[in-house]
Swiss-Prot record:
Motif Nuclear export signal 2 (NES 2), residue numbers: 360-367
Compositional bias (Basic and acidic residues): 155-169
Compositional bias of kind Basic residues: 10-19, 32-41
Record family assignment: Belongs to the HHV-5 UL84 protein family.
Chain location of the short sequence motif Nuclear export signal 1 (NES 1) per the record: 229-238
Regions of compositional bias (Polar residues) in chain numbering: 140-149
Disordered: region residues: 1-48, 136-185
InterPro entries according to UniProt: Herpes_UL84
Function description: Plays an essential role in viral DNA replication. May participate in the DNA replication initiation by interacting with the origin of lytic replication, oriLyt and subsequently recruiting other viral/cellular factors. Additionally, interacts with and shuttles IRS1 viral mRNA from the host nucleus to the cytoplasm.
Keywords, alphabetical: Host cytoplasm, Host nucleus
Motif (Nuclear localization signal): 161-170
Disulfide bridge map: none
Protein name, as recorded: Protein UL84
Length: 587
């Protein structure tokens, strides 16, 4: 079995470089750094230019806690000696400008380790992957065998039928599910714990193109002989929360400043077949008509029909919900109806295209102890809509496999614009805010589900905000650090950052759940579990994720033929290069 280059292994365990322009770091490290300098001087290219296309790759299997077992292996050797897929790809500054090597494979983690001179960080440079990169399917890896010509012809003949069935299914689903692709992948770049350079914690959509990774350079680094840049690149599973449906909240007493604009009679409680939105296989009417249908197959559904002239009140938005014109409607339910609804009930609006404002949203939904159902509908406009207003409120018991909010996400959380490259919700300030000192912003929304919310700030001049992990069943609290003596002002609807919901399996540890973007570190470690005696995990921001629970990343050679890089619906759209470029600046 081939052994790793001893110089490379010594460098992996090297101590920190001593400060000073010519300070050594030990005999082995000094020889290695001198060798690197001689290699760089031998190249006739400008500084750092070779990094754009000549970053070489070295394959590495699952790391072990024993240093002697950290052997660099080729893909063939990994497949020969181990039946498990390749897990970690390690990129180092070992390179050959004349014959850059690009390896194919599927990995859960890509590590980059570069030893640079401080002066090499002055100019922007490309650091990672000039090769097609795509993500595996969120609900299963995309490593499938190539289809034969006969299979392709068969699939093509059935494609119109599948397309028609898919359109029929979409008609049965509500808007939340039509606009959602279920789990998707997003690339995450974070520095390793032994990195001297501090790149910002960054999330990038897995789309072709070059993404900018920004970093700060401490002045102390200029006095070091060798500066280490160490990065971890991996793909997180993300999922879009429910935005058009609200959970039915239950309260004992009614306290509100708004009066009921409309009081309805008792709606009829109907029973409808249970439909699995993730896998709709049968028509609802056909299921309801079958004699085999039982109470377990039927879901209680309450439909409140409204076609009436409503009175409207103006609200500014915030804790009470979205801003705009709001109308409150009530309906008294019988005790039997209220009990039959049971828990896990969600409500959504079904609009009439001719008599409903297109921007009408459900902003609150509450059932009180006295059996009165009250809900608010809101439209963001200055003038009241024309009368009458027609819509239906449908309450249904559902098993939700996505994050959902305690109240309407607006005006705090705004979905991305159609066609936007970024997948995260925009977090905005609902009103003008002026801060003189550092302040903690509390957003009065909770979310539910076995997920993690991650807030990535959009820092403005004169203030900074940390990357924050948002735990379920808690308010989202954001710390704003004001560095300008004159304070800082947030105009109305100012962008604070973006919010992502991580669906990768995770465990919480004692790490800090909040850190500035340039202070976020990641650690690769082993942990014993009931399923595996030594499971590789990656820890970042107080959460640990097993490598096998990360979305696999597939690398392909640039000369790969198009038919060998076919993509599924849940992968990137094109097999174009996904690259990262680093821009460094002073702290």
């Amino acid at each position: 079995m081939p052994r790793v280059d001893p110089n490379l292994r010594n460098r992996a365990r090297r101590p920190r470089a001593r400060r000073g322009g010519g300070g050594g770091v030990g005999s082995n490290s000094s020889r290695h750094s001198g060798k690197c300098r001689r290699q760089r001087r031998a190249l006739s290219t400008p500084p750092l230019t070779f990094l754009a296309t000549t970053t070489t790759t070295t394959m590495m299997g699952v790391a072990s806690t024993d240093d002697d077992s950290l052997l660099l292996k080729t893909p063939d050797e990994l497949d020969k000696h181990s039946g498990s897929p390749q897990t970690i790809l390690t990129l180092t500054d070992k390179h050959d400008i004349r014959q850059p090597r690009v390896h194919r494979g599927t990995y859960h983690l890509i590590q980059l380790h570069l030893d640079l001179r401080p002066e090499e960080l002055r100019d922007p440079f490309q650091i990672l992957l000039s090769t097609p990169l795509q993500l595996g399917e969120a609900n299963g890896e995309s490593q499938t065998a190539p289809a034969t010509s006969q299979e392709e012809e068969t699939a093509a003949s059935h494609e119109p039928e599948k397309k028609k069935e898919k359109e029929e299914k979409k008609e049965e689903e509500d808007e939340d599910d039509r606009n959602d692709d279920r789990e998707r992948g997003i690339l995450c770049v974070v520095s390793n714990e032994d990195s001297d350079v501090r790149p910002a914690f960054s999330l990038f959509p897995a789309r072709p193109g070059c993404h900018i990774l920004r970093s700060v350079i401490d002045q102390q680094l200029t006095r070091m002989a060798i500066v280490r840049l160490s990065l971890n690149l991996f793909a997180l599973r993300i999922i879009t929360p429910l935005l058009k449906r609200l959970p039915l909240r239950r309260k004992a007493a009614h306290h509100t400043a708004l009066h009921d604009c409309l009081a309805l009679h008792l709606p009829e409680l109907t029973f409808e077949p249970t439909l699995d939105i993730n896998n709709v296989t049968e028509n609802a009417a056909s299921v309801a008509d079958t004699a085999e249908s039982t109470d377990a197959d039927l879901t209680p559904t309450l439909t409140v029909r409204v076609r009436h002239a409503l009175c409207w009140h103006r609200v500014e938005g915030g804790i009470s919900g979205p801003r705009g014109l709001t109308s409150r409607i009530s309906a008294r339910l019988s005790e039997t109806t209220a009990k039959t609804l049971g828990p896990s009930v969600f409500g959504r609006l079904e609009l009439d295209p001719n008599e409903s404002p297109p921007d009408l949203t459900l902003s609150s939904l509450t059932l009180y102890q006295d059996g009165i159902l009250r809900f608010n509908v809101t439209c963001d406009r200055t003038e009241a809509p024309a009368d009458p207003v027609a819509f239906r409120l449908r309450l249904r018991r559902e098993t939700v496999r996505r994050p959902f909010f305690s109240d309407a996400p607006l005006p705090y959380f705004v979905p991305p614009r159609s066609g936007a490259a970024d997948e995260g919700l925009e977090v905005r300030v609902p009103y003008e805010l002026t801060l003189k000192n550092s302040h903690t912003l509390r957003i009065y929304r909770r979310f539910y589900g076995p997920y993690l919310g991650v807030f990535v700030p959009h820092n403005r001049q004169g203030l900074k905000m940390p990357v924050t992990v948002w735990l379920p069943r808690s308010w989202l609290e954001l710390t704003v650090l004001v560095s300008d003596e004159n304070g800082a002002t947030f105009p109305r609807d100012a962008l604070l950052g973006r919010l992502y919901f991580i669906s990768s399996k995770h465990t919480l540890n004692r790490g800090c759940l909040s850190a500035m973007t340039h202070q976020v570190k990641s650690t690769l470690h082993s942990r014993s579990t009931s399923h595996s005696p030594s499971q590789q995990q990656l820890s970042v921001l107080g959460a640990s994720i097993a490598l096998e629970d990360l979305l696999p990343m597939r690398l392909a050679s640039p000369e790969t033929e198009p038919q060998d890089c076919k993509l599924t619906e849940n992968t990137t759209e094109k097999t174009s290069p996904v690259t990262l470029a680093m821009v460094c600046g002073d702290l």
